[in-house]
Amino acid sequence: MSATLVIMAAGLASRYGGAKQIEKVGPGGEILMEYTIHDAQRAGFDRFVIILQPQMLEDFRAVCGERLEGKAHVDYAFQSFDALPDWFTVPEGRTKPYGTVPAVLSGKDVITGKFAVVNADDYYGPGAFTLMYEALEKLPETGRGCMVAYNCLLYTSPSPRDTERS
Protein backbone atom coordinates (compact mmCIF):
# COMPACT_ATOMS: atom_id res chain seq x y z
CA MET A 1 0.00 0.00 0.00
CA SER A 2 1.18 3.50 -0.78
CA ALA A 3 0.72 5.96 2.08
CA THR A 4 1.56 9.63 2.38
CA LEU A 5 2.61 11.41 5.54
CA VAL A 6 1.58 15.07 5.57
CA ILE A 7 3.89 17.09 7.81
CA MET A 8 2.55 20.44 8.95
CA ALA A 9 5.48 22.86 9.20
CA ALA A 10 3.94 26.25 8.37
CA GLY A 11 3.58 27.55 11.93
CA LEU A 12 5.20 30.84 12.86
CA ALA A 13 6.66 29.58 16.18
CA SER A 14 6.26 33.08 17.57
CA ARG A 15 6.42 31.92 21.21
CA TYR A 16 9.55 29.91 20.42
CA GLY A 17 11.22 32.88 18.81
CA GLY A 18 12.22 31.34 15.50
CA ALA A 19 11.57 28.58 13.02
CA LYS A 20 11.53 25.58 15.35
CA GLN A 21 10.68 23.33 12.40
CA ILE A 22 14.28 23.70 11.22
CA GLU A 23 15.98 23.81 14.61
CA LYS A 24 18.88 21.37 14.56
CA VAL A 25 18.49 18.78 17.32
CA GLY A 26 20.52 15.77 16.15
CA PRO A 27 24.24 15.08 16.40
CA GLY A 28 24.65 15.58 12.64
CA GLY A 29 22.48 18.70 12.48
CA GLU A 30 19.25 16.76 11.90
CA ILE A 31 15.94 18.45 12.51
CA LEU A 32 13.07 16.69 14.28
CA MET A 33 11.27 16.17 10.98
CA GLU A 34 14.12 13.98 9.73
CA TYR A 35 13.51 11.59 12.63
CA THR A 36 9.80 11.64 11.78
CA ILE A 37 10.45 10.75 8.14
CA HIS A 38 12.93 8.02 9.09
CA ASP A 39 10.47 6.39 11.51
CA ALA A 40 7.57 6.75 9.06
CA GLN A 41 9.56 5.16 6.21
CA ARG A 42 10.40 2.18 8.39
CA ALA A 43 6.67 1.78 9.12
CA GLY A 44 5.80 1.81 5.40
CA PHE A 45 5.06 5.41 4.44
CA ASP A 46 6.56 6.07 1.02
CA ARG A 47 5.63 9.67 0.26
CA PHE A 48 5.89 12.89 2.25
CA VAL A 49 4.12 16.20 1.77
CA ILE A 50 5.63 19.03 3.77
CA ILE A 51 3.33 22.00 4.31
CA LEU A 52 5.30 25.24 4.61
CA GLN A 53 4.73 28.93 4.14
CA PRO A 54 6.24 30.06 0.81
CA GLN A 55 8.86 32.25 2.49
CA MET A 56 10.13 29.26 4.53
CA LEU A 57 11.18 27.04 1.62
CA GLU A 58 14.63 28.52 1.02
CA ASP A 59 15.66 28.24 4.70
CA PHE A 60 14.16 24.76 4.95
CA ARG A 61 16.05 23.52 1.91
CA ALA A 62 19.28 25.09 3.18
CA VAL A 63 19.02 23.22 6.49
CA CYS A 64 17.87 19.79 5.37
CA GLY A 65 16.19 19.80 1.96
CA GLU A 66 18.90 17.94 0.08
CA ARG A 67 19.24 15.30 2.80
CA LEU A 68 15.49 14.69 2.90
CA GLU A 69 14.94 14.81 -0.84
CA GLY A 70 17.73 12.29 -1.33
CA LYS A 71 16.19 9.77 1.08
CA ALA A 72 12.47 10.11 0.42
CA HIS A 73 9.84 11.16 -2.09
CA VAL A 74 9.13 14.70 -0.84
CA ASP A 75 6.62 17.19 -2.20
CA TYR A 76 6.03 20.67 -0.86
CA ALA A 77 2.76 22.52 -0.47
CA PHE A 78 2.34 26.05 0.75
CA GLN A 79 -0.15 27.13 3.35
CA SER A 80 -1.83 30.34 2.35
CA PHE A 81 -5.22 31.92 2.70
CA ASP A 82 -5.76 31.22 -1.02
CA ALA A 83 -6.27 27.52 -0.23
CA LEU A 84 -9.25 28.24 2.02
CA PRO A 85 -12.77 27.62 0.68
CA ASP A 86 -14.40 30.56 -1.11
CA TRP A 87 -17.06 30.87 1.57
CA PHE A 88 -14.44 31.38 4.32
CA THR A 89 -13.66 35.01 5.16
CA VAL A 90 -10.24 35.81 6.64
CA PRO A 91 -10.45 38.72 9.09
CA GLU A 92 -8.75 41.86 7.85
CA GLY A 93 -5.18 42.13 9.10
CA ARG A 94 -4.76 38.44 9.97
CA THR A 95 -1.36 37.09 8.96
CA LYS A 96 -1.08 34.05 11.24
CA PRO A 97 -1.89 30.79 9.44
CA TYR A 98 -4.89 28.79 10.59
CA GLY A 99 -4.51 25.27 11.99
CA THR A 100 -4.74 21.66 10.86
CA VAL A 101 -7.62 21.64 8.38
CA PRO A 102 -6.42 24.71 6.42
CA ALA A 103 -2.91 23.25 6.37
CA VAL A 104 -4.17 19.98 4.91
CA LEU A 105 -6.35 21.87 2.41
CA SER A 106 -3.18 23.61 1.23
CA GLY A 107 -1.84 20.25 0.16
CA LYS A 108 -4.96 18.98 -1.58
CA ASP A 109 -3.33 19.16 -5.03
CA VAL A 110 -0.39 16.94 -4.04
CA ILE A 111 -1.97 14.64 -1.43
CA THR A 112 -3.27 11.50 -3.12
CA GLY A 113 -4.57 8.28 -1.64
CA LYS A 114 -4.36 7.33 1.99
CA PHE A 115 -2.55 9.77 4.25
CA ALA A 116 -1.79 10.66 7.84
CA VAL A 117 -1.07 14.10 9.30
CA VAL A 118 1.56 15.04 11.90
CA ASN A 119 3.15 18.19 13.27
CA ALA A 120 6.74 18.98 12.28
CA ASP A 121 7.73 19.98 15.79
CA ASP A 122 6.54 16.88 17.68
CA TYR A 123 8.34 13.59 18.17
CA TYR A 124 6.03 10.61 17.77
CA GLY A 125 8.40 7.65 17.84
CA PRO A 126 8.45 4.58 15.60
CA GLY A 127 5.46 2.89 17.26
CA ALA A 128 3.09 5.71 16.37
CA PHE A 129 3.91 5.44 12.67
CA THR A 130 3.46 1.68 12.72
CA LEU A 131 0.02 2.15 14.29
CA MET A 132 -0.87 4.83 11.73
CA TYR A 133 0.24 2.75 8.76
CA GLU A 134 -1.53 -0.39 9.98
CA ALA A 135 -4.73 1.59 10.59
CA LEU A 136 -4.57 3.09 7.09
CA GLU A 137 -4.12 -0.38 5.60
CA LYS A 138 -7.42 -1.48 7.14
CA LEU A 139 -9.42 1.47 5.82
CA PRO A 140 -11.44 1.41 2.62
CA GLU A 141 -10.04 3.58 -0.17
CA THR A 142 -12.30 6.57 0.56
CA GLY A 143 -14.63 7.99 3.14
CA ARG A 144 -13.01 6.90 6.38
CA GLY A 145 -10.36 8.23 8.70
CA CYS A 146 -8.56 7.30 11.87
CA MET A 147 -6.49 8.87 14.62
CA VAL A 148 -3.68 7.68 16.84
CA ALA A 149 -4.22 9.01 20.36
CA TYR A 150 -2.54 8.44 23.68
CA ASN A 151 -4.00 7.94 27.13
CA CYS A 152 -2.32 10.84 28.90
CA LEU A 153 -3.71 9.71 32.25
CA LEU A 154 -1.18 6.89 32.23
CA TYR A 155 1.63 9.44 32.40
CA THR A 156 0.67 11.78 35.20
CA SER A 157 3.17 13.43 37.47
CA PRO A 158 2.60 15.16 40.78
CA SER A 159 1.39 18.72 40.58
CA PRO A 160 3.41 21.49 42.25
CA ARG A 161 0.76 21.66 44.97
CA ASP A 162 1.27 17.96 45.76
CA THR A 163 5.01 18.46 46.25
CA GLU A 164 4.47 21.52 48.44
CA ARG A 165 2.57 19.36 50.94
CA SER A 166 5.39 16.82 51.25
PLM regions: where:
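Residue-level signal for beta-strand positions within conserved beta-sheet cores that form or flank
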Residues: 1, 18, 70-72, 143
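N-terminal nucleotide-binding beta1-loop-alpha1 segment
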Residues: 1-19, 23, 30
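Short beta-strand segments
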Residues: 8-9, 117-119, 147-151
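Feature marks short, surface-exposed loop/turn motifs that line or immediately flank catalytic pockets
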Residues: 12-13, 83-84, 154
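Conserved beta-strand scaffold positions in the cores of enzyme catalytic domains, especially
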Residues: 22, 76, 145-147
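Conserved donor-nucleotide/metal-binding helix-loop-beta segment in metal-dependent transferases, i.e.
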Residues: 128-154
